[in-house]
């Protein structure tokens, strides 16, 4: 559409016209019974809400999460003709809100890279979590903290999804750990801003993770942040 409207597929100055045209065509095709694939980053619920609300009520909406480990995303970006850079990828991952059925989604599918081995990925994440919090709010290392959360959930008979979320809810902390406060100043204690978003993204790589478990990981800080 970008090339059609301007003659240049890389023209970033006509985004408004591009999306207006795209949404108009999607709406028309759906009304005529034609299936559509809407390929966009859509990292937050708000990002996704516009196109979902645009769909007629009779439409079945599938969300396909085209997933890859963060480092693979960065490597792939370096090989693209038009790159965005690691900083942009970091910001996007730290905004991620896992897709869930209450958004109007009928089915959620996760597309992993060819040759991806979940067991090896889980082992790597498990090893990476064995770091100190260096923060007064936690006395255990990240790994031990998650193990304790899982043990509590299991002993109290919580659901499989809650147990899954408990063991992996802080898996993104090693990626986010920084001795910098929210104002960008050096800090003596570590901070883990937006680790819940990174943890939710990383959790797609684990075997048998349900959409509910991943959603729970993504919202587990809402109570403390006053978000919803």
Task: Specify the residue positions occupied by each region the protein language model found.
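Residue-level preference for the first positions of well-ordered beta-strands
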Residues: 35-37, 161
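Conserved GTP-binding G-domain of TRAFAC-class P-loop NTPases and closely related GTPase folds
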Residues: 71-121
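Acidic, metal-coordinating catalytic cores used for nucleic-acid/nucleotide bond scission
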Residues: 38-48
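Divalent metal-dependent catalytic cores for phosphoryl transfer on phosphate-bearing substrates
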Residues: 152-228
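Conserved nucleotide-binding/hydrolysis micro-motifs of P-loop NTPases
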Residues: 1-3, 43-44, 67-73
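Active-site flanking loop/helix segments enriched in acidic
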Residues: 122-148, 174, 178-188
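Conserved substrate/cofactor phosphate-moiety recognition/catalytic segment
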Residues: 1-34
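Conserved phosphate-donor/acceptor-positioning beta-strand/loop module used by diverse small-molecule
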Residues: 58-76
